Regions:
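Boundary at the C-terminal end of the N-terminal hydrophobic targeting segment
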Residues: 22-25
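Non-catalytic, surface beta->alpha helical segment in thiol-disulfide oxidoreductase systems
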Residues: 96-122
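Bacterial N-terminal signal peptides that target proteins for export
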Residues: 1-6
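Structural microenvironment flanking redox-active thiols in thiol-disulfide oxidoreductases
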Residues: 74-83
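Local sequence-structure signature of Cys/Sec-based thiol-disulfide redox active-site neighborhoods
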Residues: 27-67
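Bacterial N-terminal signal peptides
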Residues: 8-16
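Structural micro-motif
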Residues: 84-96
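Solvent-exposed loop/turn segments at secondary-structure junctions
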Residues: 47-51, 72-74, 90-91, 100-103
Length: 122
């Protein structure tokens, strides 16, 4: 009985949050990568970082279109490493909006879409 009440309450919350409509489909990774690049949202990471590798896999082939700064190769990419120091990057991955707002850790495509201000209409 308690489980049935709990499930009913959770369903009501879900309907209230989502407005009773179908959940929005995940954004197109390529379109999102292009949007992030065009709006100057920067992605800081390291080639050694498992979380960064996972973040990249979420974008699939579009990962090459991301505005990425490599923080883990200071000898090979000193300008990028200096940018990481200037932005005080302490965790990977780190995403930074042009206004300085940041998110650390792996972000879902949906969260990046909303956070970056990308239109959610297909």
């Amino acid at each position: 009985m308690f489980k049935a009440l709990l499930l009913g309450a959770l369903s009501s919350v879900n309907i209230a949050i989502h407005g009773g409509s179908a959940v929005q489909a995940a954004p197109d990774p390529g379109a999102l990568a292009d949007h992030l690049s065009q709006t100057k949202v920067m992605y800081y990471g390291s080639w050694r970082c498992p979380a960064c590798q996972y973040q990249g896999r979420l974008f699939g082939d579009a990962v090459t279109r991301l505005p990425y700064v490599e923080c883990g190769k200071p000898k090979e990419l000193p300008i990028q490493a200096a940018a990481c120091q200037q932005k005080e990057i302490r965790r990977y991955p780190t995403w930074i909006l042009p206004n300085g707002e940041r998110r650390e850790g792996v972000q879902s495509l949906e969260d990046l879409q909303i956070w970056s201000g990308m239109s959610q209409t297909p």
